[in-house]
Regions:
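C-terminal recognition in membrane/secretory proteostasis and scaffolding
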Residues: 1-178
Length: 178
């Protein structure tokens, strides 16, 4: 049985003759977002906003009819964009999973299950991009833009920073990220 980085002998026909080749075998890491049930989920909690990577496991948390609940946009982003539009695909699409109620985020209309397009003008390709976009921003407000033309939300940066630890404590979240 072939293992990662080993070679497998194969015979193919080219120009009417047999040709023997050795093909390298490797683990395909490109589909890791489609199923990773054996590791704890990644998340980032900020001002009551809970962000997580888009994955098949995340979508299956929507229930038995998760593919219908998720909608075509999220399914396309997870399963198809990397093949149809590789230049626009993201290494680790990030979702706003839910919003934990607190006065700092009370005016937000978008409450979760949406793809994050950019934060503070920076395109979000991974959880690391998201965290960096929040932590490096020095403006008075955070601007979070969502995919599928869902619009944007704003958070007062100072109020969000001040409320973050209280929100984590209220909801029993020990770490702001995992």
């Amino acid at each position: 049985q072939a293992q990662h980085s080993s070679k497998v002998p194969v015979k193919i026909w080219r120009d009417g003759g047999e040709l023997e080749l050795e093909l390298p075998v490797f683990v395909n890491y490109k589909d890791r977002l489609e199923g990773n049930q054996y590791v704890p989920p990644k998340y980032f909690a900020y001002a009551g906003l809970i962000f997580t990577p888009l994955s098949r496991d995340y979508l299956s948390s929507f229930g038995q009819n998760w593919s219908a609940v998720a909608g075509i946009g999220l399914l396309y982003e997870l399963f198809y964009r990397k093949n149809t539009e590789p230049e626009r695909s993201r290494t680790e699409p990030v979702m706003l999973s839910t919003v934990l109620a607190h006065p700092v985020n009370a005016n937000m209309e978008i409450r979760g299950r949406v793809l994050v397009d950019s934060v503070n003008g920076k395109r979000i390709d991974s959880m690391n991009d998201l965290i960096k976009a929040f932590e490096s921003h020095e403006g008075s407000h955070h601007l979070i833009e969502f995919g599928e033309r869902l619009g944007f939300e704003c958070l007062d940066r100072d109020a969000a920073n001040s409320a973050n630890n209280q929100i984590l404590q209220t909801y029993g979240i020990q770490l702001d990220r995992q």
